[in-house]
Curated annotation (Swiss-Prot):
Species assigned in the record: Rhizobium meliloti (strain 1021)
Designated name of the protein: Peptidase T-like protein RB0614
Record: active site: D82, E174
Protein keywords: Hydrolase, Metal-binding, Metalloprotease, Plasmid, Protease, Zinc
Pfam families the UniProt entry points to: M20_dimer, Peptidase_M20
Keyword presence, Metal-binding: yes
Ranges that cross the membrane: none
Named cofactor requirement(s): Zn(2+)
């Protein structure tokens, strides 16, 4: 099977399995479809000759493609099983359309269009095949394009390149706090360094991520009948709104870019007695990150003084750290990636990613893990699309990295 056909076939096969993560679940994995996808991948890994294939109770799959260059450093690739829940359908219906410069109708029945004026980046792919969904869901190239790249890579290593041991890991629930990567026993993934394939357009390389934390703030009010509420009722919903008002409206995701940090007040559930607010804290700079956490604490204390008959409790939990510190301690992964892209004639676009990846978790565990492109655009959107030529180039980079690692 030609490389292009295999990549597209694998992507369609993996996309057909509903694996949207569920942030309300405390289970790992948070959805049964992730376990089903993990089982399929484990079977396919065994079929193409991987050794030590293991799938555990949390749907974490690991294995190794043994090398033919014993002196080469062991390297790894990691991808996540889940697709994101942004309120769209969990069922993905991918299709391949040829882009000829006109708006693409991705769902005629629902009259959903991928419009060039709104997504001018598609103009770079004039005359090419584009994988899109049907507009009712995300496409799920984040991260099933990476799974397809890694599985195609593993099946072709012996035929195309000399290589050392190549370890692979597929983990659940990246989209809800990197739960799978955090739970993974890295003794099952004993590589010197690794790669995530979890960013967007052709040439993108991520050497920095946010520092990230989540915060749960609980406001306890005082309930009362409205006919006798004066001087007594403390409305927890209004307490939460008051809390939010203490933060700069411009320090939010929709008002920031580049290296700006932000607060994201994300979920609010309230009744007459209690309101629960979720806030996400993001900053590239460690000092700025800590200042933001201290700001949450300071505002909570102000609220306690303002509402003496109510109460405010909060808990801040670190989610992941900026990957840059770990990458600086061992530069081989980045050097090989840059060399691979240079030899393939792919211009690199180094970005500070306004998000995080499983690689941030692995890096904190001692395995430096930079991130490179799948080739897709518009992650977490119904307008997510994947140009097939960019998809192929992602595989070429992975193959070249394995080859170069064996000759270092």
């Amino acid at each position: 099977m030609r490389v292009r056909e295999e990549l597209v076939s694998r992507f369609f096969r993996y996309a057909a399995i509903e694996s949207q993560s569920n942030g309300r679940s405390q289970s790992l994995p948070s959805s049964p479809g992730q376990a089903a996808l993990a089982a399929l991948l484990a079977d396919e890994m065994r079929a193409i000759g991987l050794e030590d294939v293991c799938i555990d109770a949390h749907a974490i799959v690991t294995g190794v493609k043994r090398g033919n260059r014993p002196a080469a450093p062991p390297i790894g690739f990691i991808a996540h099983l889940d697709t994101v829940d942004v309120g769209l359908s969990p069922f993905v219906r991918p299709q391949v359309l040829r882009f000829e410069g006109e708006d693409l109708c991705i769902n005629r029945q629902e009259d959903i269009w991928l419009r060039v004026a709104e997504h001018p980046e598609i103009l770079d792919w004039l005359g090419e095949d584009i994988i899109v969904g049907d507009g009712t869901s995300v496409l799920g190239a984040d991260n099933k394009a990476a799974i397809a790249v890694i599985m195609t890579l593993l099946g072709r290593l012996d035929h195309e390149v000399g290589h050392g041991d190549v370890f692979v890991a597929f983990v659940p629930d990246e989209e809800i706090g990197m739960r799978g990567a955090k739970a993974m026993d890295v003794s099952r993934f004993p590589c010197d360094f690794a790669y995530t394939i979890d960013c967007c357009e052709l040439g993108e390389v991520v050497l920095e991520t946010f520092n990230a934390a989540s915060c749960e703030i609980v406001f306890t009010g005082v309930s009362a009948h409205p006919m006798s509420a004066k001087g007594m009722l403390v409305n927890p919903l209004l307490m939460a709104m008051d809390f939010i008002s203490h933060f700069d409206r411009k320090e939010t995701p929709e008002c920031t870019e580049g290296r700006d940090g932000f607060y994201w007040f994300k979920d609010l559930i309230a009744n007459d007695s209690v309101a629960s607010l979720t806030a996400l804290i993001r900053d590239f700079d460690t000092d700025g990150f800590n200042r933001r956490k201290h700001r949450i604490a300071a505002v909570a204390e102000q609220m306690r003084s303002r509402y003496p008959t109510g109460n405010v409790r909060y808990q801040i939990t670190d989610t992941y750290r900026n990957v840059s510190t770990s990458l600086a301690r061992d530069e081989r992964a980045v050097a090989l990636l840059f060399k691979a892209m240079e030899e393939l004639g792919i211009g690199k676009k180094v970005i500070a990613m306004r998000g995080g990846t499983d690689g941030a978790v692995l890096s904190a565990k001692g395995i430096p893990t930079p991130n490179f492109f799948t080739g897709a655009y518009n992650f977490h959107s119904r307008y997510e699309f994947l140009p097939v030529p960019a998809f192929e180039r992602s595989l070429e980079v992975a193959l070249k990295v394995c080859q170069l690692a064996a000759t270092e």
